[in-house]
Amino acid sequence: MNKNILAGAALFTVALSMPLSAQEQTTTNKNTTTANQYQPVPVPEIRKIRLFISTDAKNEADDQFAIVQAILTPKFKIKGIISSQYSNTAKLMERNAEGSMDEGYAEIQKVVSLMDLATPPAIYHGAKHAIKDEKTAEVSEGAKAIVAEAMKDDKTPLYVISLGPITDLASAYLLEPKIADKVTAVWIGGGDYPKGGWEYNLFNDPSAANVIFKSKMPVWQVPRAVYSTMRTSLSEISYKVKPHGKIGEYLFTQMVDFNEWASNKFPTLNWPKGESWSLGDNPAVSVLLDEHEYGYKDQPVYVFDQKNFEYKKFKSNKKIRVYHYVDPRFTLEDMFAKIALAYPAK
C-alpha cells in the first residue's frame, strides 16, 4: 500500500471503509465491456511464474490498481489473492481492528467481480492481526494456501507480492520453514535507507517483516523512497482508466471518493495533494515483468527496531535485493495498456 507519510509515526493515512452488503459481495457485475474475450500478448511458457497477491485492499485507494494489473498480466499464473490485515493502524484510527481484513476481503471480491473474468482467481482470508512475536504464526487461509502451493512438485518460480504488511507470508514460513527456498518475497514497504523509520506497511506488522528478513527466503524490497515515485494524476486516470469498463469506472470513482474524504478529514496535512496520487503498490508487478537489473543492489540484510522502526544490523550472510529505482512510466503505462486492451472504451 503506497503510504505518503506526512509527519512521522503520529501522522498516518486513514481509509474510508464502507462495508458491502451481502448482495454487493456476491453479485457478479456484468458489463457490455468484459475481459472474457481479452486476448493477452503471448508469453513463452518458460517465462511464466506462479504468484500470490497479498493486499490490504481497503486501506486507501491504490491496491486496487495493482490487483487489476496483476490479474491482467499473462506472465502471471495467479494462485490466489490474500486479504491482509491492517489492524495496528485501525486501532489508531479508532476503527474496529477486528474488521480490517474482512473489509479488504470484501473489496477484493468487488474488484474481481467488476473485472467480469471468465476464470476468477481464488480469494483467501488472511490473518486478522499482526503476528504476536517472531515465533508464532497467525494461521489463516492465505498462509495455508501459500504453504500448500510452495510444497508442490512444481519447478515454476513462485513469488508472493505483499502490498501491505507481510503477515501472511511470515505466518506461512512459521508454519512450514521449508518454503524459504521455494518462494521469493516481493515487499512494498520499509523506510528509506540507511536509517529507516516509521512506514505504514512496516508499522502494521514489524515482527512479520523481521521473520522474513531473518529467514533464508529471497527478498526483493521496494522501500518508500522508490514506491512513492509512481506518480499519476486524477486527470490521467480519468482519461486512461475510467472509460474502460465497470472496473475502470470503479477504479477512478473510488479514488476520487477517497481523495475527497481524506482531504476533508485532514485539511491541514499535505496529503492527499488534491489532484495527484502515487500508485505505490504497482512496482510489485513491474519488477516481476522486468527485474530492473540496474535499479537494485544486493545488500546485507538489516532488521527492524520494534519501537522506532529504524534499520538495525543483523549478523547474517544473507543479502536481499533492495530497489533504488523502478521505472514509473513502464509500470503505469503497462497497467493503462492492459486495462484498455481488456476493456475497450465504447
Q: What is the predicted role of each segment?
A:
Residues A9-S17:
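Bacterial N-terminal signal peptides
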Residues M1-G8:
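Bacterial N-terminal signal peptides that target proteins for export
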Residues Q23-K346:
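N-terminal acidic, glycine/proline-rich low-complexity segments
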